[in-house]
């Protein structure tokens, strides 16, 4: 979308005095969904009742799957494959205890199995599953698959599944694992070369891994839906597992539709088109974002709170980035620090509703935390909202001063303005009794794990979105900073930033490995924030520009049920 310099009559630093102010307004396209996600009361009741009926069948199928897990408990390969399929179908949260027990067994017996095994598929799958769950498995197990020239042995066509699993396993690598760095390049090139000769369902799996996302980086709900369509094509598929996956997916979709309807009604009350016409109207995409962070039914309150907070963050971003004058932003930033309804009279008219909405959402956080019996979390939630405005104002200062930061200076601020630290804290708020005070303080201490997520968010956004941003008055992105600092081409800058992004993924993988003092449930929130970035910013800024592919993802999760 092209940008336009628009002359707007707005309130300046005093709400009683208006001036003609020329503003650089980004011409964002309107909401593509209209009111389609606003459900009537009868629609909500119908969805809820069907989900309740289906849950009876689901509970019976879960018993059957537990029996199958028990039957496979002493068969290494069978157990390995059963756990993998359960996870790929999006069912792992139903069988956490059983999967933990299975993985302990696989870890304890892995060395003996791997020592005698030349099966690349089983070794790679073992490595991936165990590393995903924090077990420190050495990458040296792949040395036996190297050839005399230091490359990897090329399998016959029947061995493609082994190479695919090896490719998936390389996405769990950490810094210093050269064999997996080489293995990633080799397996990717090999799979690309054989893809045209493959037939479904294997071709669909290889294509997905190469052109969408790996198992590690894909969005669990999207990957589960895709895997169902692949899995049912294999003659060996387990009918009970497949039926359970489809029913479970649709039950969750019904729950999510009801949640999105309630959030959409709240957003309609804010009335973005009338009150904030300069901003991106993207509540559906924001709920999709948060759904990527956690989809399980027990986190419904968390999704509601986090969606509202990220919606406020988006409004703040557009206000600071593409509308407010520096003086208006200064006044607003000061009001945020004071955090009081008494500040409303000092704000420009168009900022009053935004400030009031921020206070209302913070009141809602306070109410929910009081219900949960965790009042200490209230301050963390409010501080998370304040941090958005604080960091956006620092960016506005750079823009006002025409400051040209170095790449490292830019990243120091940009890892704050990406908002991921605040969003991670927000997503912890309503996670029951899992997060303790020390876990919130851990996020605020900038550990490598959290900073890796901020780097992934910022660089992925910059790489695909910097050209659009630079068409208006905007601070340079990491691409421009690196290009100017190192006197290099944009292509070289982007390649360097991709390398940094990959290094951040390695740090993220390292943070999962045991021992760790942070509960896995919290670590997965951070990982899932990175996964949603991989989906929404891999080939463009699909939050700002909601094209057919992004709309298709939304439909898969929030419109079309899986055919049963």
Curated annotation (Swiss-Prot):
Group of enzyme by EC: lyase
Cofactor note: Binds 3 Mg(2+) ions per subunit.
Sequence motif DDXXD motif, location on chain: 317-321
UniProt cross-references to Pfam families, sorted A to Z: Terpene_synth, Terpene_synth_C
Molecular-function annotations in GO: alpha-copaene synthase activity; magnesium ion binding; sesquiterpene synthase activity
Alphabetized CDD domains for the sequence: Terpene_cyclase_plant_C1
Enzyme Commission code: 4.2.3.133, 4.2.3.-
InterPro entries with a match to the protein in the record: Isoprenoid_synthase_dom_sf, Terpene_cyclase-like_1_C, Terpene_cyclase_plant_C1, Terpene_synth_N, Terpene_synth_N_sf, Terpene_synthase-like, Terpene_synthase_metal-bd, Terpenoid_cyclase/PrenylTrfase
Binding-site residues, Mg(2+) 2: 317, 321
Cofactor: Mg(2+)
Key words of the record: Lyase, Magnesium, Metal-binding
Segments crossing the lipid bilayer: none
Pathway in which this enzyme or protein is active: Secondary metabolite biosynthesis; terpenoid biosynthesis
One BP annotation, GO: alpha-copaene biosynthetic process
Chain residues that bind Mg(2+) 3: 461, 469
Record-linked Gene3D superfamilies: Farnesyl Diphosphate Synthase (1.10.600.10), Terpene synthase, N-terminal domain (1.50.10.130)
Binding site for Mg(2+) 1: 317, 321
Enzymatic reactions: (2E,6E)-farnesyl diphosphate = alpha-copaene + diphosphate; (2E,6E)-farnesyl diphosphate = delta-cadinene + diphosphate
Signal peptide: none
Organism domain of life: Eukaryota
Family label: Belongs to the terpene synthase family.
UniProt comment concerning the protein's domains: The Asp-Asp-Xaa-Xaa-Asp/Glu (DDXXD/E) motif is important for the catalytic activity, presumably through binding to Mg(2+).
Function of the protein: Sesquiterpene synthase converting farnesyl diphosphate to alpha copaene and delta-cadinene as the major products.
Protein name: Bifunctional sesquiterpene synthase 1
Organism classification: Eukaryota, Viridiplantae, Streptophyta, Embryophyta, Tracheophyta
